Amino acid sequence: MNAPGTAPMDTTPFRARRARLLQRMQAAGGGVAILPTAPERVRNRDAHYAYRHDSYFYYLSAFREPEAVVVLVAGKETKQILFCREKNEEREIWDGYRWGPEAARAAFGFDEAWTIGDLEKRLPDYLADQPLLWTSLGYDNDWDAKVLGALNAVRDKARTGLTPPHSVRDLRAELDEMRLVKDASELATMRQAARISAAAHCRAMRATRPGRHEYEIEAELLHAFRAAGSQAPAYTSIVAGGANACVLHYVDNDQRLNDGDLLLIDAGCELEGYASDITRTFPVSGRFTGAQRDVYQLVLDAQAAAVGATRAGNTFMAPHEAAVAVLAQGLIDLG
């Protein structure tokens, strides 16, 4: 855990992304962008699921707390605003450190920061006389209601000369375009996530033998992920022995591993919001049968063809088509 009052990482890339988004908004006519993080979810009674921030929100903010919203104003003068939870000594005793607006503004590089309770009051002021509203509607009914409430609050002041934005742009679509090209910090994080996951798969392979259970191998993966510093699995791990591997999203992971079967593992860690994803299949006993080896080699050849077709200038589908061609011919050859 980072010491209270210090940012969790270098926030320079996040500030640069906000500045780049503001430039794109200005080029499209200006306006205001509003982006909330993910809500907390109750697991049972007073227990919550482990919190995970919204990816789009984190991409711009580096801020991991729930109950937070980023507002970006792309006018003649740009403005970057963060709304977050207020400092609360009692809740921090229960739940841990909270940044609070003042410390968060300085640490994460925002021009202004306010408590999340101020959002409803201040949002109409940011929206007034702006040409465009950049947000994403249709994903969360509660959030949609807050946005519509703010727009209606501006409309209610029409007699004073204020006007609301005349149209809404999909903010996620704009951010998707930005996220297609990774910056240096993203690439470094993704490579480290891949290294952690590759080492976890090797650990799982070494631990596999007939008589063990799928969940025991899953535990090896989870141990390796967390011990290397990742925050969580990127998705529920698939550890599927024998026929279970034919279920595309098998997650029970509770069956015994048998001699002669293959074990499929589809698992990867998440590191600083970035996912890794690795799938490997290998013999439970450590040695392929003849038929298993033939099919394994065919899949490996298809993967090599796909990798070879992954290069600048090719279409998105080129790697897939290269793999399909190898698989189709290989299956014919195998009879």
Positions of predicted regions on the chain:
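Active-site neighborhoods and metal-handling regions in enzymes and metal-associated proteins
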Residues: 1-335
